[in-house]
Each structure stands twice: as C-alpha cells, then as structure tokens.
Amino acid sequence: MNKQIFVLYFNIFLIFLGIGLVIPVLPVYLKDLGLTGSDLGLLVAAFALSQMIISPFGGTLADKLGKKLIICIGLILFSVSEFMFAVGHNFSVLMLSRVIGGMSAGMVMPGVTGLIADISPSHQKAKNFGYMSAIINSGFILGPGIGGFMAEVSHRMPFYFAGALGILAFIMSIVLIHDPKKSTTSGFQKLEPQLLTKINWKVFITPVILTLVLSFGLSAFETLYSLYTADKVNYSPKDISIAITGGGIFGALFQIYFFDKFMKYFSELTFIAWSLLYSVVVLILLVFANGYWSIMLISFVVFIGFDMIRPAITNYFSNIAGERQGFAGGLNSTFTSMGNFIGPLIAGALFDVHIEAPIYMAIGVSLAGVVIVLIEKQHRAKLKEQNM
C-alpha cells in the first residue's frame, strides 16, 4: 500500500477513534457538570452546524493552499477541541470545544478525501475510498469500547487520550505526507447556472425528503442513546461502551455480508421501507424493556436497521442521478447535515420532558418514512402505467 495513503487512513482512523472514545462517558460527564439532555443536543448540533459551514471552505482552501496544510490545521484543531472538553467545567467552554471540533472535521475530511483522489490511480480510486469508509466505521466501533474502559480510571481520560491521538496524527502527517505535484484542483469547474436548468429536480424530491427526515430521526435517537441507557437502567460508561460497540459490530457485519444480497432481491425503496419497519419494531421493544440484559440485547440489534438504511438511500440517490453523481452526492450530504443539526436539538429538549420522548419521535419519523416510500412507489407505478 502507498505509504501516504496508509498515513491518511491512519489519520482518519485516529480521528474517528477519538470521536468514538468520548461517547460512553458523556452521560457521566454531563451529570458531573449538572447539564441536561437539551445541553447535549446543543453540543451535538453545534458540532454538526460547524462542520456543515466549514466543509465547503475547507475543500476550497485545500485546493488552493495544499491539502497537507489543511489536514494538519484540522488535526491541531481536533486536539485543541478534545483538550478543551477534558478541562472544561462550564457549558460555554464545552460549546466552544464542539464548534472547534466541527471545524476540524470540516477541514480534515475534505483534505483527506481530496488527497486520496490525487494520489490514487484511477483504477484504484473506488477501492481506496471503500477502504476509507471501512476505516471510519472501525474507528466508530472500537472507540466507544476503548473509551468505556478508560472511563473506569477517569471520565475525563478519554478526552485527553483523543487529544493525544490528534497530536500523533499531526506529527505523522508533517513527516510522511507530501502534496502531489499534480492535484485534482484543475478538475473543479466554475458553477454554470444554466446547467441547473437541465437537472430534472422532480426525481430528487423523494430522496431529499427521505434523507432529511431519516437523518433527523436517526441522529435524534443516536445522540441521546448513551444518556437514555444511563438514566433508564443506570448503565455505566463500560456498559454503554459494550452496548454501542456490540451494536456497531452487528451493523457492520450486516452491511458487509447481507446488504448486497438484499439489493439483488429488493428495490432500494422496498428495502428502505422494510428496514424502517424493522427499526420501528425494535424501538417499540426498547420502550418496554426495563432490564439490564434486555436493553443490552436490543442495543446489539437496534442499529442494524439504521445501518442498512444509510447505504440504501445513497444507492438510491446514485441510481436516479444519472450523470449528475456529484450533484446528487452534494444534495445527500447537505440534507443529511441539516437533519444531524436539527434532530439533536429537538431530541435533547424532548428528553428533558420525558425519557422515552426521543424514542417516540424516532418511531414516528420512521413510520413517516414508510409512508413517504409507499407514496413514491405508488407514484412510480402510475407513471409506469401511463408510459405503457
């Protein structure tokens, strides 16, 4: 494997490992500072909004100033963010930490993806991006597991460790990464407004609505999950880490071994509908579960439906996009970010009203998604009849 690509993969792994590390300790951390579910929602939303705003600028600066420089700046910001959260004793410091963290993600991700595109031969580009996705998932899966055990020593330790990982990634980037002589910068063209009139906007309405609605519901549930289990059955950081890591492993296994097989027998819309119904059933079981082991077992399988929906929607976008793959990818990313910003805000406020309220909201949103899919399938059937 190319040495630079290995370093880029390692950087991405460290960043997402660092993000995952802190998930199990958030409930203890927030209670220690006397913060609420609404506060957690604000912290998560601040990260998402900051990343959404900075990402376009991060990509542009990476093209103009060099991707290595932007990656290194992003890694330093990541470490600063984690250290600030580790020493923070009031909400203002934590909020500033999350804003800086979002900025770091908005710089590192465009820089890394752009550099991988620059240094990858055309026949290996898709494979290299596939590896990047798998490495991101690996960081998310291993992070909570490691963070939960670190929290047995101190609930601030995972934040210090994440910050140290950022510094390590920064040093490796300085020493081992080099900007290529030829980059993809010249491949970016100036937006021509007349091209927008050639796009069939109607075909994107359903996937855009689905993306917004589902990212809204899923982020609302996932944001509050650690706090939910801690309050409902008194899960410790170690328990939360086992639940989330187990759920991540099961979700990844289903993505790797079963997603392609399901796609051979179902259309994307049909598969999304069934995945949503599966999620509704599991979420209802979660509402009625009150024991340690029942919630642990549900935690292992609750994320499967969500993990299957995401690639199905991406695949659906891609299939209807035709030659507008970049445009479709941009729409998908934009409306996912919007849902990730709005969802935690509302879920946090609902959690303070009733512990089960965010779950009810996720159930309602999932059912709304099923209705949207059914309406779209019916509309497609009518169009097919008219064209016959």
From Swiss-Prot:
Key words of the record: Cell membrane, Membrane, Transmembrane, Transmembrane helix, Transport
SUPFAM superfamilies according to UniProt: MFS general substrate transporter
Compartmental location: Cell membrane
GO terms, molecular function: xenobiotic transmembrane transporter activity
Main location: membrane
Keyword Transport: yes
Topological type in the membrane: Multi-pass membrane protein
Keyword Transmembrane in annotation: yes
Membrane-spanning intervals of the chain: 5-25, 42-62, 69-89, 99-119, 129-149, 157-177, 201-221, 239-259, 269-289, 293-313, 331-351, 355-375
One GO term describing the cellular component: plasma membrane
Alphabetized NCBIfam families for the sequence: 2_A_01_02 (TIGR00880)
Family: Belongs to the major facilitator superfamily. TCR/Tet family.
Protein function: Involved in quinolone resistance. May constitute a membrane-associated active efflux pump of hydrophilic quinolones.
Protein name: Quinolone resistance protein NorA
